[in-house]
């Protein structure tokens, strides 16, 4: 699945992955459990009868299922599900062996010696599945007990239970800070090339990251062929010394192998395409939730924020011939600081879309006047242009006015 990675392996080191690849894989790893939980909760609300018990025991089920999947990946590829997507694997860290020289001379022997041991596989499985599970449980316990500590309801001298809870609340944040500091320090040393292990557990158990190569894919092809040919019909009746015909049991065995072989191929094809597609979906959801594009798409449209405004609609010739309109137009041409509506000095100035300034109370009363109909109302009293922020409720006949902006003088 490393072919689905967005990294060009030709421009990178053929042996040691970069820290940014490792961090990217770890960030994607953290998205798996919350994404599955979100999908499960969504469908639990629709079908609570069938999924409520599953949702209540999600942590344990996720631990078991993901543990099985990751164990298979670590046993076959020495890589986790996400690391394989990025073309990464874990190998033994032989500090006394020159891997570059052996890689060019005896690559197969080197790859065999670098395969993870059973202990290292178990430790890697615990790091991927067990550590996040314990972290979630401890965080939940800390959030549950912390209010008791703030209310002084935990007396360490009362009982052994309260003693453990009290010092857990005191030491747990310190322990997390120390582990985080060590983790960051190891990553900095890995970035500088001093250390080959970017995490505490990998450093303690002498493991490091490497890239998947032709040896891993050849080994996988051998496993696939063995899996498909496990019940191959060619194994029956091919001997030269065989005289008797095929028995009923052997006929059923051949029928079973003919039926299961397409199913096995379909299972392999589905696993090879469905899982990478789900990872691409997770990456898309991560981008969607973190980008401004999603915010703009979910934001309701504002009629005043459109870049292309509709052209203004002027009053008809009959309305423009009105003496009152002509008087307002003539009055607005004077720049004496008076309101065109009340003809007094402007108080509490407000501007409308056409740029003319009025008293706030005057322009608001004018635009909300019930005497104006849909044709004459909702317009600038000076230019006669229709205002976008004025809308009439045809049921009640009342005007809704937006777009009046007060001026700070």
Swiss-Prot record:
It is found in: Peroxisome membrane. Zn(2+) binds at residues 339, 342, 359, 362. It holds the Pfam family Pex2_Pex12. Pathway: Protein modification; protein ubiquitination. It is a multi-pass membrane protein. Residues 1-18, 76-117, 193-273 are peroxisomal matrix. A zinc finger (RING-type) spans 339-384. It comes from the Eukaryota. SUPFAM superfamilies: RING/U-box. GO terms for cellular component: peroxisomal importomer complex; peroxisomal membrane. Component of a retrotranslocation channel required for peroxisome organization by mediating export of the PEX5 and/or PEX20 receptors from peroxisomes to the cytosol, thereby promoting PEX5 and PEX20 recycling. The retrotranslocation channel is composed of PEX2, PEX10 and PEX12; each subunit contributing transmembrane segments that coassemble into an open channel that specifically allows the passage of PEX5 and/or PEX20 through the peroxisomal membrane. PEX12 also regulates PEX5 and/or PEX20 recycling by activating the E3 ubiquitin-protein ligase activity of PEX10. The three subunits of the retrotranslocation channel (PEX2, PEX10 and PEX12) coassemble in the membrane into a channel with an open 10 Angstrom pore. The RING-type zinc-fingers that catalyze PEX5 or PEX20 receptor ubiquitination are positioned above the pore on the cytosolic side of the complex. The RING-type zinc-finger is degenerated and only coordinates one zinc ions, preventing E3 ubiquitin-protein ligase activity. Belongs to the pex2/pex10/pex12 family. Component of the PEX2-PEX10-PEX12 retrotranslocation channel, composed of PEX2, PEX10 and PEX12. This is Peroxisome assembly protein 12. It comes from Komagataella pastoris.
């Amino acid at each position: 699945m490393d072919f689905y990675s967005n990294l060009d392996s030709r421009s990178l080191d053929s042996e040691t992955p970069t820290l940014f690849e490792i961090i990217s894989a770890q960030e994607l790893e953290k998205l798996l459990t919350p994404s599955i939980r979100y999908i499960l909760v969504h469908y639990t609300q629709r079908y609570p009868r069938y999924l409520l018990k599953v949702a209540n025991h999600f942590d344990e089920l996720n631990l078991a299922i993901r543990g099985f999947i990751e164990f298979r990946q670590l046993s076959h590829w020495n890589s986790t599900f996400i690391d394989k997507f990025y073309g990464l694997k874990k190998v033994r860290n032989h500090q006394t062996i020159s891997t570059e020289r052996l890689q060019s001379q005896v690559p197969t022997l080197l790859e065999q010696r670098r395969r993870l041991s059973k202990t290292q596989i178990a430790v890697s499985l615990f790091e991927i599945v067990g550590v996040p599970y314990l972290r979630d449980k401890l965080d939940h316990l800390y959030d549950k007990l912390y209010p008791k500590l703030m209310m002084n309801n935990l007396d360490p001298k009362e009982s052994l239970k309260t003693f453990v809870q009290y010092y857990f609340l005191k030491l747990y944040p310190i322990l997390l800070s120390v582990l985080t500091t060590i983790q960051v320090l190891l990553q900095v040393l890995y970035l500088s090339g001093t250390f080959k292990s970017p995490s505490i557990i990998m450093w303690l158990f002498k493991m490091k990251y490497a890239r998947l190569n032709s040896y891993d894919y050849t080994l996988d092809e051998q496993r696939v062929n063995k899996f498909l040919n496990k019940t191959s019909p060619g194994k029956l009746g091919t001997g030269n010394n065989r005289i008797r015909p095929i028995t009923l049991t052997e006929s059923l065995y051949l029928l079973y192998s003919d039926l299961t072989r397409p199913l096995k191929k379909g299972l392999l094809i589905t696993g090879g395409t469905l899982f990478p597609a789900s990872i691409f979906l997770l990456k898309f959801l991560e981008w969607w939730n973190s980008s401004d594009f999603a915010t703009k798409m979910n934001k309701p449209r504002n009629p005043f924020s459109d870049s292309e405004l509709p052209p203004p609609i002027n009053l008809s010739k009959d309305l423009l011939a009105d003496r009152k309109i002509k008087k307002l137009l003539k009055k607005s041409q004077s720049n004496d600081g008076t309101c065109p509506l009340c003809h007094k000095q402007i108080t509490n100035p407000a501007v409308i879309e056409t740029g003319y300034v009025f008293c706030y109370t005057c322009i608001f009363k004018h635009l909300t006047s019930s005497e104006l109909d849909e044709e004459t109302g909702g317009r600038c009293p000076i230019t006669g242009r229709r205002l976008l922020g004025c809308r009439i409720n045809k049921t009640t006949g009342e005007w809704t006015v937006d777009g009046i902006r007060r001026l700070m003088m």
